[in-house]
Amino acid sequence: MKRARFVATFVAAALGVAAMVGFVWHAGPVHIAEVLVRMRWAVVVATLFEGMRVVSETWGARALYGPEVPRRALVRAQLAGYALCYVLPAGRAVAEACKAAMLSPHLPRARVVGVALASQAMALVAVGVASSLCLVVARGSLSGPLATALAAHSAVTLGAGLLLLVTAARRMPPTGKGIVLLAMLGSRAAQGAAVFVLLRAAAPHANMLDGLTVWGLHLMGASVGDLALAQVGFTDGALLLGAAAAHLDAASALSVALAVRVAQMAWVGVGLAAGASTEGRLPCAVHRRVGMGVE
């Protein structure tokens, strides 16, 4: 099982990198660089929106963990989880396992595992809701295979989240799940705002429908590329495939995808530093310590 997972991860990463090289060559590296320079201040704003995502999800986690967990420990765990979520394959599940491992000294093992399950379920539901919103509002822009793919993505993520809520309900904390859902929806709203700011900087003619189209494609690409490191090549490919639907040229579409990744990587650096400050390293052996199985 571990070998198969390693092979799948390696293949996904290799395909993603190869695809990314092809995308940049197709769009023109000089043109992409020009667009990114024009977007530099928008990247700063997008980074702030990413910080709002961290704050929102930390607020939701606080509702589940309760006052027994020290605030500093919770913030460190959330930052470390954010970093793992965006750089490792199956990032969200690994992030929840990491947070559970880091916070297990403060709460019983069953409690932290239950919180991780609830967070994972609500994250899936929030992605499903956000994708459905993009699909419904921007359905005039999307058509054919792209619309079908986004509809399937919305149904799968929403269904998976609800199924996890039902099947693991007994292991989850009895209270706080509503606040977590609000926090996850707020996190996705901040992500959507970041995407729109970047889109407007790359293409000043873009409107709200174009923004929802790009956001929906980004969500879908991130899920499809869940096995790849940092979803390289997958979010970029999704935006490139939907560039015409969002009235973008190839360079602008790729620039938005790259700028989103830059904003995320800024917080990944903060998260890695926060995780390393606990034990001198991130608790990577979370599966041995907590026994998570939420992928």
Regions found by a protein language model. Give the residues of each.
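Transmembrane helix boundary and interhelical loop/hinge segments in multi-pass membrane proteins
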Residues: 93-99, 234-239
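Predominantly cytoplasmic-facing regulatory/coupling regions of multi-pass membrane proteins
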Residues: 1-80, 108, 127-227, 234-237, ...
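Hydrophobic transmembrane alpha-helix segments characteristic of membrane transport
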Residues: 62-63, 99-101
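Generic hydrophobic/packing signal
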Residues: 68, 87-91, 101-107, 129
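Structural signature of transmembrane alpha-helices in multi-pass secondary transporters
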Residues: 82-85, 119-123, 260
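Membrane-interface helix-loop-helix junctions at boundaries between adjacent transmembrane segments
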Residues: 100-122
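Short intracellular "coupling" helices and adjacent cytoplasmic loop segments at the cytosolic face
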Residues: 79-97
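Hydrophobic alpha-helical membrane segments of integral membrane proteins
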Residues: 114, 231-232
